[in-house]
């Protein structure tokens, strides 16, 4: 769906999400071992997918064992819609696209306020550096 793709809120049960919608991604991550994956614009049960620690960290990283880079889709951060850069980083996105000045300030402010930890920032940076070394 392209209409309202940044605002659509998919209301879905955990079972349906896992058995139908995430299954193909799980197979791709486990069998394909991609270096990077991209989070999406839409909301899932009221949370922007790029801001979802459940999707990006708990499922992709911990359950599926994904250790590569997670990046947001282009212009995912739309503060007036509730999707902000620091929440993307806290959820497990390593690269927030396109990486504008507002996104950088959002991350700095969240760090100063204690909403984003140094450990989370270092983890993101580490995965980016690992990807760079793999591609060099």
Which ranges hold each PLM region?
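Glycoside hydrolase catalytic-domain context in secreted enzymes
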Residues: 1-136
């Amino acid at each position: 769906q392209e209409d309202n793709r940044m605002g659509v809120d998919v209301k879905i049960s955990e079972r349906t999400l896992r058995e139908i919608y995430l299954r193909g991604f799980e197979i791709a991550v486990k069998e394909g071992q991609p270096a990077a994956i991209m989070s999406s614009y839409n909301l899932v049960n009221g949370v922007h997918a790029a801001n979802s620690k459940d999707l990006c960290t708990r499922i992709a990283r911990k359950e599926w064992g994904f250790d590569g880079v997670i990046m947001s889709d282009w212009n995912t951060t739309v503060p007036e819609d509730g999707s902000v850069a620091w929440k993307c980083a806290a959820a497990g996105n390593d690269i927030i696209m396109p990486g504008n000045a507002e996104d950088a300030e959002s991350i700095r402010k969240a760090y100063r306020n204690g909403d984003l930890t140094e450990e989370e920032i270092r983890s993101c940076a580490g995965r980016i550096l690992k990807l760079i070394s793999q591609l060099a």
